[in-house]
UniProtKB/Swiss-Prot annotation:
Superkingdom: Eukaryota
Full protein name: UDP-GlcNAc:betaGal beta-1,3-N-acetylglucosaminyltransferase 7
Polar residues biased stretches: 49-62
Purpose: N-acetyl glucosamine (GlcNAc) transferase that catalyzes the transfer of GlcNAc via a beta1->3 linkage from UDP-GlcNAc to the non-reducing terminal galactose (Gal) in the linearly growing chain of N- and O-linked keratan sulfate proteoglycans. Cooperates with B4GALT4 galactosyltransferase and CHST6 and CHST1 sulfotransferases to construct and elongate mono- and disulfated disaccharide units [->3Galbeta1->4(6-sulfoGlcNAcbeta)1->] and [->3(6-sulfoGalbeta)1->4(6-sulfoGlcNAcbeta)1->] within keratan sulfate polymer.
Glycosylation site list: N88, N94, N214, N391
Family from the record: Belongs to the glycosyltransferase 31 family.
Iron keyword on record: no
Membrane topology (UniProt): Single-pass type II membrane protein
Amino acid sequence: MSLWKKTVYRSLCLALALLVAVTVFQRSLTPGQFLQEPPPPTLEPQKAQKPNGQLVNPNNFWKNPKDVAAPTPMASQGPQAWDVTTTNCSANINLTHQPWFQVLEPQFRQFLFYRHCRYFPMLLNHPEKCRGDVYLLVVVKSVITQHDRREAIRQTWGRERQSAGGGRGAVRTLFLLGTASKQEERTHYQQLLAYEDRLYGDILQWGFLDTFFNLTLKEIHFLKWLDIYCPHVPFIFKGDDDVFVNPTNLLEFLADRQPQENLFVGDVLQHARPIRRKDNKYYIPGALYGKASYPPYAGGGGFLMAGSLARRLHHACDTLELYPIDDVFLGMCLEVLGVQPTAHEGFKTFGISRNRNSRMNKEPCFFRAMLVVHKLLPPELLAMWGLVHSNLTCSRKLQVL
């Protein structure tokens, strides 16, 4: 072989060896190292759950459950981000053949048609709310059209604090919303909400309609969100947007409590019966709930719970079919865990006095002693807040803590 041919041959071999070495080196790197950015996460389609806790396809919700393989240890840790990105859930038309279903009122038929649609995409999210040392997360159920209520809360009891006092962490506030229930209003209110969220950065919103029966969706969406983004927050206060809250009393009450406790405190209703009168807002037909009474549950307005219990509550709720009354549904979830909610005199679901005309319902000295009072509209809330935090002299101090 001539010298020229030998030189060309050696050059080709060297180039081939270099190419193989570069290929091996590239394959040894992870995509994130090579591209300087992590690969996008693989999103699994969201599934609904039957009462026994087995995962099933939403379209097979009413069919017999099939055996499900045990989740891997990695899957049991739960998602690291909100993992529902699309809404693809059709009505369960199999119900139309059931005689008991055919006699139900339209709103209950609509609820049952889509009861298996459990989770929806997030439209507005603020995972940063739980970064750092957060002691108390204040969460308020609101409706997209009720900006005035959210604004009044931000100016009063929903004002955030850098410290809860006594070496405790921050107090942060979030509002929970769906979308406008009237289609013709949806675009307009969504634009206003986007501007509001740019101003305050305190709104969690999901892609379901804000209706009375969908308040239960708001409960389970928040619990799932909490499980993902707030794994270490010690305590949560959850309330409506028409209540008066005394944050000082809430924090004083929590001072001696431990986050590991089964703490669930509010105005607890025992042995409450389902309402069968069709003209009542809380009417429930026997076909939907046939028992004589509900499990104990905290009535409307607000309640306090430990963060560790809230995360267990998320998984307990996922073993039950949805129920159209959100407070009762949470009571059912607590029953699954074997946890009894605790009654406290500082939580007033029906005002300080059940007699709406009573002067007690407008007496600031009573409000100063309470934790939560339901219900007040924005002008009443602002006025009462000003009175409670004025140089008020009360003849005697109520002891409710």
